[in-house]
Amino acid sequence: MPVASSEYQNEHYASFATTSRLVTCLVSETLVPVFFVPVKSVDRNNQFIGLCLLLRPTTVKQESELPTNITASDILTVVPLRGLPILNNERVALFNGIRCPQIDLVDFLDMLPHIYSVESSGSLKSGDSLKQKTFDTLSAILDGNKTFDLVDGYSAVQLWNHFAQDLEINSKLREQIGQELGSSILFQKYTYDNPKPLPTLNSSTIKWEQSVVEGHATHPMHKARKSFPPMPPLNPGSYDLDHPAVRLVGIPRENAILRGEYEELSAPLVNALMDAGGNHKDIRAQYQNYVFIAIHELQLPNIQEKFKDAVIFSKEHQLNVEALASLRSVARPDILPGLSVKLCLGIKISSALRTVTPFTTYFGPGFSFNVVPKLTYDHEVLAIERELGTITYRHEDSDVAKHCSSVIREALEYDPKYQDDLFIPCGALVEKIQRPDTDETLVAHVWNLDTKEKRVEFLDRYVDFALRSFLPPCLINGVAFEAHGQNTLARFDRKTGLLKGFVIRDFGGVKAHNETLKKSAGVELDILPDSCVEAHSLEEVFKLLYHTLFHCQLQRLIRVLDLHYSGEGWEIVRKYLTQYVPKDHVMWPMFMESSKVPGKCLVRMKIDELYRDYIYRPVPNMIKYEPQSVPEAI
């Protein structure tokens, strides 16, 4: 069992975890001018190589403009770096004769765990050597009064408020986003304060699902759990989100939209809920004109307020279930072997309320039964978990209906016939070992990847199998799965730890090009009007695959295996892309020739209050990454 680090440490690291992700987004989404400030002499002992300098958005009038001189009051924040971010050597600012290239992309792993605000009215107070080096490096490029102080621990909420004020974002949205960032920090600290036993090759999939420490590597709301009325406020420790209760609710049959085999597949869980407080035969006889649904306990106030004809059974009719990494999907393998259940949860987790829209409940079963069997993919390395049955409340407003719906999904990981295999959410592999003050991750710890040779061997097989899994449906059928670390499970042999393949789940974020699908597989998408599943071009499909598989999944593994800065990890990616993508395919130039690719803008989407519609901006194509050298100061 890991020992919890100190409360002060946890508070500092929790703030850093969230704020560093906000910095990452401000940089990659070009929301502010950002430059790399080289240190005069690199000191490898404290890993300090330079600064990530974020200027206020008011510093330049146009995005294309390069500032020529800056003062302390122009600075939004400054972050000392231990690893080189992705530099744009074609856009270099000259500050006091020091060449400062623009930063196009920075990762939280590039940063030392200190984020400073600049107090231009003060003077430097005593601090550690890193603070002094940061001060000296910064002073060298500033014009005007160089009397200022650096204050460590600049929080995401403070940074956001400063940025939003400069950008004149309306006060209501500013406050809302600030609250979500604050929630992220609070829940991150709670996770650090309460470390769990480290999972092993013998652990259950559920233990791995619940081993997530920091979550999404680039989303500032990576740990946010924010409820809204009529739900009570959700605070760290106020509810056990890993082991929630589900309650029995009945919906008049005429108000239930059913797809697939929902009633048959949900029957064991529904009967168990009925039997927990009575007899399922008697209850079914009494409520013959009702369909039944398991509802997350925290969601009950929304059911009560929005669905007046729903029957909420007494608290006796409840069962505890195991939450998966998403928190709203749950499992009870003893009651529903080989299945999992996606529930509605009216809580904002990262980007949106974790409800289940009618678009999702309609699309899943049709895609599962009609399209999945026709897709081109290697069944030896990829298993696709179909969505076999869904239920949604019949309501003309989809924003209301999404609060009372559910999906029954295949789950190989909970099927007894696969007990010799270990299924792990890929995002869990790259998580820290339940401590904030370490670089050691579960993949290196559990697989004992203590040499470079072992790390290269592990990554090589992983990339090979991942591309064999997710490229063919995209290349041939025009279908991209949302293959990020939460939706993708890696399948290992429990005895040897050898990777056997992957599993993909959750069709809510699939993108498909109907014309290509029809031409290659002879089937078409069956979707509701305004569904965001249908892509109007193949580029849309490739964008989703790049963001989820390459940016969110493979990049994380390459970085934690320490194969990023050397470029070796990306060489492996290019090796297999060259093997599996024909040079005359339209995917080739986007992935293998373009220096920039469309990057998903998480903060711009929050500012524009978007969830189902994405905003993209050009970001460096990491597939093309080559090693960089630290620029000289002059």
Swiss-Prot record:
Q: What induces it?
A: Expression is repressed in iron-replete media.
Concerning Pfam families, the annotation shows:
FhuF, IucA_IucC
User: Enzyme class, one word?
Assistant: ligase
Q: What is its EC number?
A: 6.-.-.-
Q: Name one GO biological process term.
A: siderophore biosynthetic process
Outcome following mutation: residue 484 to A? Impairs the catalytic activity
Picking any one GO molecular function of the record gives:
acid-amino acid ligase activity
Q: Which UniProt keywords apply?
A: Ligase
Q: Which InterPro entries match?
A: Aerobactin_biosyn_IucA/IucC_N (IPR007310), IucA/IucC-like_C (IPR022770), LucA/IucC-like (IPR037455)
Function of the molecule: NRPS-independent siderophore synthetase that catalyzes the rhizoferrin biosynthesis from citrate and diaminobutane via an ATP-dependent condensation of citrate with diaminobutane followed by the addition of a second citrate to the monocitryl-diaminobutane intermediate. Can also use as substrates the citrate and diaminobutane homologs oxaloacetic acid, diaminopropane, diaminobutane, diaminopentane, tricarballylic acid, hydroxylamine and ornithine.
Protein's name in the database? NRPS-independent siderophore synthetase rfs
